Amino acid sequence: MKKWWFNSMLSKKELEHGCGLSKSMDSLGPIENTSTKEDPSLNDPEKQIHSSRNSESSSYSNVNHLVRGIDIQNFISDDTFLLIDTKGDSYSIYFDIENQIFEIDNDHSFLSKLQSSFSNYWNSSYLNSRSKNGDTYNGHSLYYTNDSWNNHINNCIDSYLHSQIRSDSSILSGNDSYILSYIFNESGNRSESFSKRSITNGSNLTRRESSHNLDVTQKYRHLWVQCESCYALNYKKLLKSKMGICEQCGYHLKISSSDRIELLIDPGTWNPMDDDMVSMDPIGFHSEEEAYKDRIDSYQIKTGLTEAVQTGIGQLNGIPVAIGVMDFQFMGGSMGSVVGEKITRLIEYASNKFIPLIIVCASGGARMQEGSLSLMQMAKISSVLYDYQSNKKLFYVSILTSPTTGGVTASFGMLGDIIIAEPNAYIAFAGKRVIEQTLNKTVPEGSQAAEFLFHKGLFDPIVPRNLLKGVLSELFELHAFFPLNQNKGED
């Protein structure tokens, strides 16, 4: 493994020039290799680092000598880049493309020091002279605030990494990868340690943080939940009282089936059904990584559930209801034979008792470890729903949460008399990655979101989580299902 030394004071133009980025740094095209001959100073580390350590003035010549004279593909094959400021503080980036590793040693003092150095350099007479000659970066503004400086650093690394990764498509394949880490210090103030967006042809690139950051992240993990949309951190103890809704942007985070039951069902009225029913690996599914039975056991320990759905009877504002709630935390909410059987028995019970039915969907689809048996659950549940709705003339409400995909979407998820979706829920039959890999077509962004599908007529209302219980209560009363105490008062 090699180690390279960079002077830290780089303008965007110089990084483009020194690294051979002939295109805009904001574009995501491949880096073009330069044809400059190798400089002898590349083989002499002392020559590479003298200007950054022995001079307080800015210098970029080492970067030009370093990068332009070597093959850019091999440049980050297995190298550690050590960026140092004028005071000698270091900041290292380790690349190993072959083993798909990108490791950053985060130094909290680095960005602030680098920002100060960059500001001085940006206003230097050399850069001003280049501006007078018209040598500016695509006419972009030369004024940088604190936020734009962070964005500038992130964009430079984004473009550079993306170009390198795309040049070797045999290594990576898959979807976009978004990585963002937040660290909390002892006083509880948030500091964004580093942010980057790696848009690649693959999702297998991993980022390893320094051991210090991992320790801090693990230390505060039990206190905070990060929003999937705005990346804000929500205090975990308060998040439950807010029904799992991000207080910064209003995004509906995933919540457990138990939390959802607590949200919808009146306290003290929940009576679970068939909670002792477990899968017995009906087809003897073989896996080299982990046996199916062992995987079931591990998820049971992790979630405290026996399967990916909870079913039972309860009251919603005094109205008796049969409710099934799927839990995405248990094997992605996948539908196996036990899940199908529990939902089938719930529907049959609701038919016999003439009570309304609610099923909250959160699933990746049929469970592959049970083969055709899991697929048959689609037909079994649909047939018993036909009897419940068409013959008994009873009322079924389907609630689609994020994500609802595959066999659940193709069966009982879309069979409700009223189909309700949560805001920004991901609802689809085939996932985006599957469609793109199968048809070689790009799926438009947001085309599988609830708001887009609502305008296509796929379901009825989009109801925020905090209003859901009231909406369901009004729907039931509209269909002549009234609270028990109200019926007794009328008698």
Curated annotation (Swiss-Prot):
Molecular function terms from GO: acetyl-CoA carboxylase activity; ATP binding; carboxyl- or carbamoyltransferase activity; zinc ion binding
Cofactor note: Binds 1 zinc ion per subunit.
CoA carboxyltransferase N-terminal domain mapped to chain residues: 223-491
InterPro entries, per the entry: AcCoA_carboxyl_beta, Acetyl_CoA_COase_Trfase_b_su, ClpP/crotonase-like_dom_sf, COA_CT_N
Top EC class of this enzyme: transferase
Catalytic activity: N(6)-carboxybiotinyl-L-lysyl-[protein] + acetyl-CoA = N(6)-biotinyl-L-lysyl-[protein] + malonyl-CoA
Subcellular location per the Swiss-Prot or TrEMBL entry: Plastid, Chloroplast stroma
UniProt KW keywords: ATP-binding, Chloroplast, Fatty acid biosynthesis, Fatty acid metabolism, Lipid biosynthesis, Lipid metabolism, Metal-binding, Nucleotide-binding, Plastid, Transferase, Zinc, Zinc-finger
GO biological process, one term: malonyl-CoA biosynthetic process
Cofactor(s) the record lists: Zn(2+)
Alphabetical list of Gene3D superfamilies matching this protein: 2-enoyl-CoA Hydratase, Chain A, domain 1 (3.90.226.10)
Cellular component, GO, one term: acetyl-CoA carboxylase complex
Pathway: Lipid metabolism; malonyl-CoA biosynthesis; malonyl-CoA from acetyl-CoA: step 1/1
Residues noted as binding Zn(2+) in the record, renumbered to the chain: 227, 230, 246, 249
Start-end of C4-type zinc fingers: 227-249
Position of the signal peptide: none
Basic and acidic residues biased stretches: 35-49
Span list, region Disordered: 26-59
EC number of this enzyme: 2.1.3.15
Subunit-structure text: Acetyl-CoA carboxylase is a heterohexamer composed of biotin carboxyl carrier protein, biotin carboxylase and 2 subunits each of ACCase subunit alpha and ACCase plastid-coded subunit beta (accD).
The family this protein is said to belong to: Belongs to the AccD/PCCB family.
General function of this protein: Component of the acetyl coenzyme A carboxylase (ACC) complex. Biotin carboxylase (BC) catalyzes the carboxylation of biotin on its carrier protein (BCCP) and then the CO(2) group is transferred by the transcarboxylase to acetyl-CoA to form malonyl-CoA.
Official protein name in the record: Acetyl-coenzyme A carboxylase carboxyl transferase subunit beta, chloroplastic
Species whose genome carries this gene: Spinacia oleracea
Name of the encoding gene: accD
